[in-house]
UniProtKB/Swiss-Prot annotation:
Induction: Induced by white light exposure. Residues 613-640 are annotated as: Disordered. Residues 623-633 have a biased composition (Gly residues). The keyword Transport does not apply. This is Heat shock protein hsp-1. The keyword NADP does not apply. Interacts with E3 ubiquitin-protein ligase chn-1.
Amino acid sequence: MSKHNAVGIDLGTTYSCVGVFMHGKVEIIANDQGNRTTPSYVAFTDTERLIGDAAKNQVAMNPHNTVFDAKRLIGRKFDDPAVQSDMKHWPFKVISAEGAKPKVQVEYKGENKIFTPEEISSMVLLKMKETAEAFLGTTVKDAVVTVPAYFNDSQRQATKDAGAIAGLNVLRIINEPTAAAIAYGLDKKGHGERNVLIFDLGGGTFDVSILTIEDGIFEVKSTAGDTHLGGEDFDNRMVNHFCAEFKRKHKKDLASNPRALRRLRTACERAKRTLSSSSQASIEIDSLFEGIDFYTNITRARFEELCADLFRSTMDPVEKSLRDAKMDKSQVHDIVLVGGSTRIPKVQKLLSDLFSGKELNKSINPDEAVAYGAAVQAAILSGDKSEAVQDLLLLDVAPLSLGIETAGGVMTALIKRNTTIPTKTAQTFTTYSDNQPGVLIQVYEGERAMTKDNNLLGKFELSGIPPAPRGVPQIEVTFDIDANGILNVSATDKSTGKQNKITITNDKGRLSKDDIERMVNEAEKYKADDEAQKDRIGAKNGLESYAFNLKQTIEDEKLKDKISPEDKKKIEDKCDEILKWLDSNQTAEKEEFEHQQKDLEGLANPIISKLYQSAGGAPPGAAPGGAAGGAGGPTIEEVD
């Protein structure tokens, strides 16, 4: 096993998870709060940046500067209808930057800061990287990061960039359902060929993939899904329902208050989880809005009615992927549930009914399966030779058809959807008019017949074609998809051998090399800020506990009579003065806390050592720098 462990990271819309393959099995790694999944939340305050649990715990107190759902922004345009509808639910501010890219605007340390979705995602990835490093005790460089199978080219590319900004070498971007299939099928060697349907409904995205698994070979037959459907959408329905109820009962509009809305959302999320195991859930929020308490309840039936169309819509991709895989329902051996939202009984019932009452497979942990599979893939790619993974082969597919625009705005597909990747294909095209000097090659992805209905990935010009009648020049266009599902396109004029190529990266509002460099440096800077903040708090806590310890020492029954009243008063006054100073200078610099501590030590040490010489023995507790609640001390926050 190489010294440097490669990890697998499931970068989720709402929660993320990290795993590592070691000693022949996968370890899912718990974070510093002991949780095996970490909220994909980043918060900015007057003093610090928080990532994960700490960020989510303070969201009600700081709704405008707590960013989540970055995965619903990444690789999308600002005017994407999905982005526009999400913005109505987000308390943080999303603005349109150059190239119509969405960015988030927050206030950090009293200044306005603007971040790309890639940067926010990179902060979550950084947290996962640090979680793994704390567990492994070494630095982590290499990672396999997962994306929804239905993510398009720009979303994949942007996710890869986020990894780079976090200082990770992304070995491979793999599809979430495929990763989950590895988790499911890893121990099923020698069971013959099995057709497995992975139904992955998470916090923000939905995928269905059908694979054939046989002796460690995982071949994806088809994939379908919706990159904008998940638990968050079910929460939204419940939030809207209760907002309307509040308006009816109290004639007040909750939507005008982000904090109230956030507290309601947190309660809805909790109620939704309760409804997966009970038939009714109650919501009790004290002083939700203008001092009004909100006590109400919701039944499972009501919740199912609120989300009925969303639940039903999860069945369409299942049928589509069956059609694409040219498979009958009866040929599916196992239906495997992945993602937290598959715990919803109604979703399970719809799926089971679609397969005429077939039992669903719940053998893998729906929250951890994706990170588990990613960790296995990371081990393989970094050359792990252990028996569990050595014969494993992954054959994934391109989720969307890829092609170019030909005369009349027609989409001519070179690579059909569900083609196994990596793949390379070439086709020869010609000019449309006489003596045409160049051709514009426009690359699209999507299933519609006309390019205007599909997604433009990028375009480039092949110029310098020698004059010739239309139809004579031969231009060979080559599409090449790598194992990450990212596309390279080249065009060659056969008569002159002139070539031009692009990795589909430009036009996409994709980050340039310079942008990434700059963001990597900024990420380092923010990390240094976080460290400095930790040291500062450490110095503050150290001073505070030293002052309290000193006071306790001089109050000690055994020592009371060994210390002169004036010495005792000196120390008491100084301690009180310092504790008072601390109260009014919570935000002082580390050096100031250290200076105050030196000051106090200077006064106390001679008195204390005099004391112990007379009493004999070493001083308890109040040794200089008695940092009881030191740098790693817990900070306690109220959670709604």
